[in-house]
Amino acid sequence: MANFDLTNLAVKMICPNNVVKTDDTDLPSVLVYIPKFKNSDVLTGGNDSTHPAFIVNGVEIPGFYYGKYQAKVYNSVAYSLPGEDPTASINFDTARARCEAKGAGWHLSTNAEWAAIALWCKKNGFLPYGNNNYGKDSRESNYKAVPSYYESGKIARVATGTGPISWSHDKTMAGIWDLNGNVWEWQGGIRLVWGELQILANNDAADPDNPQNATSTCWKAINAADGALVDPESKTTDSSAHVSGKTVKLDYVNNKWTYSTSITNAKDESRSCAFYQVAADSSIGDAAKVMLRALALLPDSDVTTDVYEGDYMWWNNGVAERCVSRGGWAYGASAGVFSLDGDGSRGDALTNLGFRAAYIPEIR
């Protein structure tokens, strides 16, 4: 038996849902398997449809493999490895390329996949902690991870997987690490164009054959009445928003983000509210709300208090295109698995902005 097979066997003996997977470079990444489930398995207001993370190009998949660790790039290829300073200062398109360089099935984490994991965490009663306060979680005083990068004399990033067990998504060694803080993580398959929410269908963003460049025709808007995916009203080449009253938009009303078919308050700046405060007005139908909740973009139907432990959502609805990252950075309780930053240009390359790779073997 090869040394790699022994390594994989040893990992699976300790963490049965983990796998050490080599890519086209014959180098390993550690992945966590997420099996298929329905919206109703993780959402009070969910239907019995398969969660979108488990549908690619119209075909259901049994599950997906998610990077156990934030990505580290070596020789222009992304890896999921413990004890590494996660690669940051990387823009959206380059992050995608570093994941796709691993070979067939490999891709940048998609928002659908991130949402599936976040909703699973919430349903199972545990939202992971992480490096959101200079090397530690703002709610923990005694735990710190191994520093890997400093800014202004303070710990900015920590080595992947070196935090306490509370930094794992399922609070075990078998879980996914650092989903809360450390670096924001780019997510594929979602953007905002002049305030209009645009996505790729289900988890189609996992397939590199479905382009995500600024002018790709794979981008779709959401019909507010029935949740169907339709051609967008607004394009990145437009000079302002196009609003017909049919597709889902993001409006900023009474200092909180509200899904609507109209935009009464558009600004080219980052504005925020607590995730539990995000709302949908009467123009958004039930099917569209289920889709938004399944993508961890709207609180569950029974939420009236901050059960998301302070996670925040930022958007910019007054500019041609903004891409999305999730998880947070040095924002204390505002960081977390439901935290979202929708104010990033696809060209942004910041020291607090990284990514994570995922793998679906059915994509060839």
Model-predicted regions and their roles:
Residues S49-L179, P208, N223, K256, ...:
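Short aromatic-cysteine micro-motif
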Residues M1-N18:
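Charged, compositionally biased non-catalytic regions
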Residues M1-F4, R139-R157, T162-S166, D170-L179, ...:
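C-terminal, surface-exposed recognition/capping segments
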Residues E113-A116, I190-W194:
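Amphipathic alpha-helical scaffolding segments
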Residues K122-L127, R191, L200-N202:
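Short secondary-structure boundary/capping segments
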Residues N75, F126, L192, E362-I363:
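A generic secondary-structure boundary signal that marks alpha-helix termini
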